Structure formats: C-alpha cells, structure tokens
C-alpha cells in the first residue's frame, strides 16, 4: 500500500530564519527549493509568513523577510497567508502582545493560535470556493 501524498502543504516559515539572521538570499533559495520539492510530489503550497511578535519586531529588517516570502510565493505560484500583517494589525489596533503571544515574546498563545487557525481555514475555503465570497449559490455545472 502506497502512502498518501500531501495535497496541501501549509509552511509556517520565516520567524526562525529572521531571528537567526539567515541572509535573505539564502532564505529565498531555501523557500524555492522546498516549494520545488513539494510541487514535484504533487502538493500545493501556502506559505504562512513570519509572526509579528516582540522577538521579531526588534530586528532591524523583519519586513524584508515578509517581502522575500511574497516574492517567492508569487514566483512559484504558491499561496501566501499574511500572518505578519494580520498580527501587526491586531497590535496596531490596540491589542497587547500578552493577549496573543506567550511570555517568551516569540510563540503564539492558545488564543493567538485559534485566531490564526480560523483565519487560515476561512482563507483556504475562500480560495477553493470563491462563491463563498459572493454569496452565489454553489451549484455544479
């Protein structure tokens, strides 16, 4: 019996690379290679970009990693879930980090994970069923 292959890969990436100060050209090359391997096995990709958390925001070039991810996603035909921008909007709208980040300043707490999970699920459903966005009836042709 052959193992089932992944149809969709959601790759949470960028946070550790940014913190470890991986040069962005190397980061981009690793993204391309990973997507190429997965696509060669028949998987579709969604890149989930880095987290907007104190450990990342303190870096001098955190937005450069988000930019590189967007470029590679477009180049490789992968989806991009903009977690960085979503979390930044929470913070800019007055939500304190403590409400969605653990005490280590790096990882999402249960509330943050739940919110990101729901938004990601809705994004995937909207991508595979655009009629959800328009309210049009979902009738087969």
Which residue ranges define each predicted feature?
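Alpha-helical cap/lid subdomain in secreted, periplasmic
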Residues: 1-141
């Amino acid at each position: 019996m052959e193992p089932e292959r992944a149809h969709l890969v959601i790759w949470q990436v960028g946070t550790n690379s940014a913190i470890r100060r991986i040069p962005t050209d190397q980061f981009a090359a690793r993204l391309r290679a990973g997507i190429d391997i997965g696509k060669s096995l028949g998987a579709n990709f969604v890149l989930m970009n880095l987290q907007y958390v104190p450990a990342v925001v303190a870096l001098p070039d955190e937005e450069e990693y988000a930019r590189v991810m967007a470029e590679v996603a477009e180049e490789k035909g992968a989806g991009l879930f903009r977690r960085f921008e979503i979390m930044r909007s929470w913070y800019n709208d007055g939500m304190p980090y403590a409400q969605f980040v653990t005490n280590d300043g790096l990882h999402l707490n249960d509330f943050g994970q739940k919110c990101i999970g729901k938004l990601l699920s809705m994004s995937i459903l909207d991508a595979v069923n655009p009629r959800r966005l328009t309210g049009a009836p979902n009738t087969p042709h």
